[in-house]
C-alpha cells in the first residue's frame, strides 16, 4: 500500500548545507558566509551570484570561475528530562564534521548578455544520534541533501537595470534509519527492530532576479527562487522478526518533499573607496511544507506507520554587513543576521530540531595576483536551547527534554579565476 508524505529533515544544513531558522542554506560561496547573507542579492562580486541573484552576472567582466569547499561542525546534543518514559540515554552529538563543495562559472558574451552555470548545495540535513538514545523511535540516522545544477542567463538593459534567470535541476537523496519498539510497555524482553528508507530523485524549479542601480556604488537586488518538489519512493526495509513488523516490511512508501519558495531583497551601498554597507531581508515559505516524517508505532495489538505534520510557519531573516577595503589586495567582510523560527516550541520535533538563530560571520578576500582571488569565510549559528516533547500515540512512550546550547560553525574557502 502506497503512502505519501512531505518529509523533509533539513537544516542542520549539511554537505555544504547549514542551519537556519527554517532549513535553507546561506553558506554558498565563502564571501556570503562571512557576510551571513547581507547584500547577497545585490553584491554581484563573483560568479556565486548565480545562487543568490543571477542578474548579478551582468556586473562580471570576461570569464570567471569559482571553486569552493566548506566544512561544517557543531553541537546538537539532547538532554532528556524527568518526563521521559522511553528508555535510553541522551545519545551522541547529532552533528558531526560535514564537508561540501560548490562550483560556479560566468561568461560575458557582450555588453548586454552574460551566461553562467552553478553547482551547489543549498538544502539539506544530516543527523546521527546513535542506536541507544531515548529518541531512537523517532530518528537514529537521517539525511536529506539537495544538489542544484543551475544554468543561468542575464541581460543588462542599461546602466541601471539588469535581469537574470536560472533553471534549477535539483537532485535529492533521502536516507532514514529508525528503531522500532518490539517490546511495547516493556511486556517482552526483545531487542529493537529497525526500518530503513533510501531513494534519490530529481526536482525542478527556477531562480529569478533583478538589480537596479540608481547611481554608481548603489545596487538594489530582488531575487526569487521557486518551490522544488522532490518525490521519493522506496519499500521499507524492516529488520526484526515478529507479527508486529511483518506487515510493514516491503511497504511501498512515497515521500514528497517540498523545498519552499523564497524571496530576497538586498542593498549594496558603497560609502567611499574603502567602506560599503550591505543589508538583506529574506522570506521563506515554510508554512506550505506539510508533513515532516514517517513514524512507526507499536502496541501489544500490532504496529502502524503514520505521518506527522511539521506545523511549520514562514521564516524571515534580517542581515546587516560591511566590507572594508584594507589594501588594494585585501577586502574584509563582516556580518550579523537573525532568522525567525520555522516552528514553535510546542511543535518542534526530534527529527528536525530547528529554531530561531543568530548568525555572526567574518572573512576576507585576498588578491593573489591580478586574475586570482582567495576567499576565506567563517560563521557561527547560535540556536540556544531547543525544547522538544513528543509522545507516541499507540505506545504512549514520551521523549521530553531539550537540545541544549545548540550551535553550528562553518568554514569555507574558495578560489576565483578571472580571464
List each language-model region with its residue ranges:
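Transmembrane beta-strand segments of Gram-negative outer membrane beta-barrel proteins
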Residues: 23-39, 58-77
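Mid-chain, structured segments of secreted extracytoplasmic proteins
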Residues: 69-97
Amino acid at each position: 500500500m502506497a503512502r505519501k508524505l512531505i518529509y523533509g529533515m533539513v537544516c542542520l544544513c549539511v554537505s555544504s548545507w547549514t542551519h537556519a531558522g527554517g532549513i535553507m542554506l546561506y553558506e554558498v560561496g565563502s564571501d556570503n558566509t562571512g557576510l551571513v547573507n547581507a547584500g547577497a542579492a545585490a553584491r554581484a562580486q563573483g560568479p556565486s551570484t548565480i545562487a543568490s541573484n543571477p542578474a548579478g552576472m551582468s556586473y562580471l567582466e570576461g570569464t570567471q570561475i569559482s571553486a569552493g569547499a566548506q566544512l561544517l561542525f557543531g553541537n546538537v546534543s539532547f538532554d532528556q528530562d524527568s518526563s521521559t518514559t522511553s528508555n535510553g540515554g541522551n545519545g551522541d552529538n547529532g552533528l558531526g564534521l560535514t564537508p561540501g563543495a560548490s562550483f560556479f562559472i560566468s561568461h560575458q558574451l557582450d555588453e548586454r548578455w552574460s551566461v553562467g552555470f552553478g553547482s551547489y548545495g543549498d538544502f539539506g540535513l544530516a543527523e546521527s544520534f546513535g542506536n541507544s538514545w531515548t529518541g531512537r523511535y523517532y530518528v537514529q540516522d537521517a539525511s536529506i541533501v539537495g544538489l542544484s545544477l543551475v544554468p543561468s542567463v542575464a541581460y543588462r538593459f542599461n546602466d541601471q537595470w539588469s535581469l537574470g534567470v536560472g533553471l534549477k535541476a535539483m537532485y535529492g537523496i533521502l536516507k532514514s534509519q529508525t528503531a522500532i519498539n518490539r517490546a511495547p510497555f516493556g511486556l517482552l524482553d526483545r531487542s529493537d527492530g529497525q526500518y530503513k528508507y533510501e531513494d534519490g530523485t530529481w526536482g525542478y524549479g527556477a531562480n529569478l532576479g533583478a538589480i537596479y542601480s540608481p547611481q554608481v556604488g548603489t545596487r538594489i537586488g530582488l531575487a526569487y527562487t521557486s518551490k522544488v518538489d522532490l518525490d521519493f519512493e522506496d519499500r521499507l526495509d524492516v529488520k526484526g522478526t515478529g507479527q508486529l513488523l511483518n506487515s510493514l516490511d516491503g511497504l511501498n512508501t512515497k515521500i514528497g518533499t517540498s523545498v519552499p519558495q523564497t524571496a530576497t531583497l538586498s542593498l549594496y551601498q558603497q560609502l567611499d573607496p574603502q567602506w560599503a554597507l550591505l543589508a538583506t531581508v529574506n522570506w521563506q515559505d515554510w508554512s506550505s511544507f506539510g508533513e515532516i516524517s514517517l513514524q512507526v508505532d507499536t502496541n501489544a495489538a500490532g504496529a502502524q506507520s503514520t505521518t506527522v505534520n511539521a506545523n511549520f510557519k514562514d521564516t524571515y531573516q534580517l542581515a546587516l554587513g560591511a566590507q572594508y577595503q584594507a589594501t588594494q589586495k585585501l577586502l574584509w567582510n563582516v556580518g550579523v543576521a537573525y532568522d525567525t523560527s520555522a516552528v514553535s516550541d510546542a511543535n518542534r520535533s526530534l527529527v528536525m530540531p530547528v529554531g530561531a538563530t543568530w548568525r555572526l560571520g567574518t572573512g576576507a578576500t585576498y588578491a593573489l595576483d591580478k586574475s586570482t582571488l582567495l576567499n576565506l569565510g567563517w560563521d557561527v549559528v547560535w540556536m540556544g536551547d531547543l525544547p522538544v516533547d513528543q509522545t507516541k500515540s499507540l505506545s504512549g512512550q514520551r521523549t521530553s527534554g531539550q537540545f541544549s546550547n545548540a550551535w553550528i560553525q562553518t568554514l569555507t574557502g574558495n578560489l576565483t579565476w578571472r580571464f
